[in-house]
Regions:
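Intrinsically disordered, low-complexity basic tails/linkers immediately adjacent to helix-turn-helix/homeobox/MYB/SANT
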Residues: 112-124
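Short, amphipathic alpha-helical "recognition" segments used to contact nucleic acids or chromatin
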Residues: 64-79
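Short, solvent-exposed alpha-helical "recognition" segments
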Residues: 99-113
Length: 124
């Protein structure tokens, strides 16, 4: 991005009361909780889709969709990891990573997540 474009972007798009100069040599957002807070605030303003479009590339958004489907399928327990891999067009190692993450969760969390995903499936 050219300096001229960046300057124009800052002047034209960001209100003066929001822009600030920082002399700190470290990033402003350093923890996962900071990102979660951003998402919550964007969602409250109904701008979460815009935030995700800016933060994630198309491929990253597709990977997130795949991860949601992986977790959903694993929690359903109706298909083998190999079948899930074939269904979603992802590698078995990707399914295994999702399975390993689920193993770190307690039963209440898994039950909540299974219910949450089942109740929030898009209408088809």
């Amino acid at each position: 991005m050219s300096d001229d474009y960046q300057g124009t972007l800052q002047q034209d798009k960001i209100p003066d009361e929001i822009t600030m100069t920082t002399t700190n040599d470290s990033p402003d957002f350093t923890e996962w909780q900071n990102v979660l807070d951003l998402i919550r605030h964007a969602s409250a303003e109904q701008r979460d889709e815009l935030l995700f479009q800016v933060l994630l590339t198309h491929d990253e958004r597709e990977a997130l969709i795949a991860r949601v489907n992986i977790v959903h399928e694993l929690l359903n327990g109706e298909r083998s990891q190999r079948k899930i891999s074939e269904l979603l067009g992802v590698g078995v190692a990707t399914i295994t990573r999702g399975s390993n993450e689920l193993k770190h969760q307690d039963d209440d969390t898994k039950a909540w997540l299974a219910n949450f995903l089942a109740q929030n499936k898009p209408n088809q």
